[in-house]
Curated annotation (Swiss-Prot):
One of its GO terms (molecular function) is NADH dehydrogenase (ubiquinone) activity. Belongs to the complex I subunit 6 family. Its EC number is 7.1.1.2. It is an enzyme of class 7 (translocase). Core subunit of the mitochondrial membrane respiratory chain NADH dehydrogenase (Complex I) that is believed to belong to the minimal assembly required for catalysis. Complex I functions in the transfer of electrons from NADH to the respiratory chain. The immediate electron acceptor for the enzyme is believed to be ubiquinone. The chain crosses the membrane at residues 1-21, 27-47, 48-68, 91-111, 141-161. Disulfide bonds: none annotated. InterPro entries: ComplexI_Subunit6, NADH_UbQ/plastoQ_OxRdtase_su6, Nuo/plastoQ_OxRdtase_6_NuoJ. This is NADH-ubiquinone oxidoreductase chain 6. It is a multi-pass membrane protein. It is found in: Mitochondrion membrane. It catalyses: a ubiquinone + NADH + 5 H(+)(in) = a ubiquinol + NAD(+) + 4 H(+)(out).
Length: 173
């Protein structure tokens, strides 16, 4: 289990690196999906299964729609892949910054494999993520409404920004 969590953390970092190296949106979405699956798997291994499932469903339901729009509007005849020199240069630079951060920060505790699970005492224990669901819907109604309106406003702002010369989303390719 320890090596599995280490593998998930490595996949999470590599997925973030795949997005941050700035390839075409066609390839950047693959890195985001990899990072999302690894992060939700990491939460799942810690025992927070419901929150992991909700985060994954929200990600697939919401964020991939934004990437469909960005891929449709990008319409590059020659998209930049991960093998292009500029993208490889960004990736090498980010790995260099990561290595320098580990060297300057020290390796104390980095190689100490061990995972403490949440609520592993038995069947009679109340899971923290399940009791948190009631708090989401009872105390968090106002925040959900504010977040929903914020996301709706963000959708309209992004659609207005990518509209381009009052022609809408349909462009001549």
């Amino acid at each position: 289990m320890t090596y599995f969590v280490f593998f998930l953390s490595l996949c999470f970092v590599l997925g973030g690196l795949a997005v941050a190296s700035n390839p075409s949106p066609y390839y950047g979405v693959v890195g985001l999906v990899l990072a999302s699956v690894a992060g939700c798997g990491w939460l799942l291994s810690l025992g927070v299964s419901f929150v992991s499932l909700v985060l994954f469903m929200v990600y697939l339901g919401g964020m991939l729609v934004v990437f469909v729009y960005s891929v449709a509007l990008a319409a590059d005849p020659f998209p930049e892949a991960w093998g292009d020199w500029r993208v490889v240069g960004y990736g090498v630079g980010f790995v260099g910054v990561l290595v320098m951060g580990l060297v300057v920060g020290g390796f104390i505790g980095c190689l100490n494999f061990g995972v403490i699970t949440v609520d592993s005492t038995g069947m009679l224990s109340v899971r923290l993520d399940f009791s948190g669901v009631a708090m989401f819907y009872s105390r968090g109604v106002g925040m959900f409404l504010v977040a929903g309106w914020g996301l709706l406003l963000t959708l309209f702002v992004v659609l207005e920004l990518v509209r381009g010369l009052s022609r809408g989303a349909i462009r001549a390719v």
